[in-house]
């Protein structure tokens, strides 16, 4: 009897406001409903069972913009006709949207048969979307939608993915000798200044260091007691750095040995002129002695007089060569002492610069004040009368 009553049920408007929980059922044969519970709907066209269908409360909707999720327009054939299945996410107040999800119980719907395009798309959507935190509303519009829509563009939402963590490219070490001052970063400027100061202080003399200081800061005041010069970063420019590089190239250690060899050759020519003259006179005297000895057979008296004269000349020349050799030894000794003094001074200067750099980097001596005191002793010639 109940089957006949369900079969005689007339067409009812789908989810009308007057009947919030109508009995849904299109005209079909008797016994098609698998269960006798009220509100149960067997829709073979959609392949799903609805636990309850009710009108969505407009106050329950979120009035914020959410991601648009639209499935492809899939034509579902039925015995009575064909209706287009359309699903979307509500983005405002839409009175035509009806919720197929119960507020208390979540029912899993099998709207798409396994193996179809929409089944694959729905599985891909489930991986992109958290269904438990979203409020989806399904629509059944009356107008037909073209079934030739783009599946991927309609179904898959444009969900912002997390940015890929690309490995940071390591900055290649640039050749600072070829970069202008303005193209360097702060770290590169500090590194290059330390490199220049170390190169100049270790490979160049005092005169070259003073010239470079004048190039960097022409108004710098340097006293004879100063042992260091601090280079400020704002003093250097591209033009000054270019001049410093050219000066270092001109006075580099590769060029210095040639100049020193040239100076040494001139000095040796000037200092050993007496030695060469002495050696030449000695050789001439020895030759004259040999010639006089060879000619002794012809004239004995002449050879005796010549040999005595040549011996006296050779003795004076030997004294001259000894004094010249002594002068050379003295000059070599003085040059060696001068080199040792320069080496010790350079070593002490490097040590002071290293200590000053450590103090500057530590920051412990920023507020240091150096006071110079001068004590003058007065000569007390007269006795001081204490009793007065």
From Swiss-Prot:
InterPro entries: FAM199X_fam
Biased composition (Low complexity): 288-312
Keyword annotations of the record: Phosphoprotein
Basic residues composition-biased segments: 330-349
Pfam families noted in UniProt: FAM199X
List of residues that carry Phosphoserine: 316, 321
UniProt-recorded name of the protein: Protein FAM199X
Species of the source: Homo sapiens
Gene encoding the protein: FAM199X
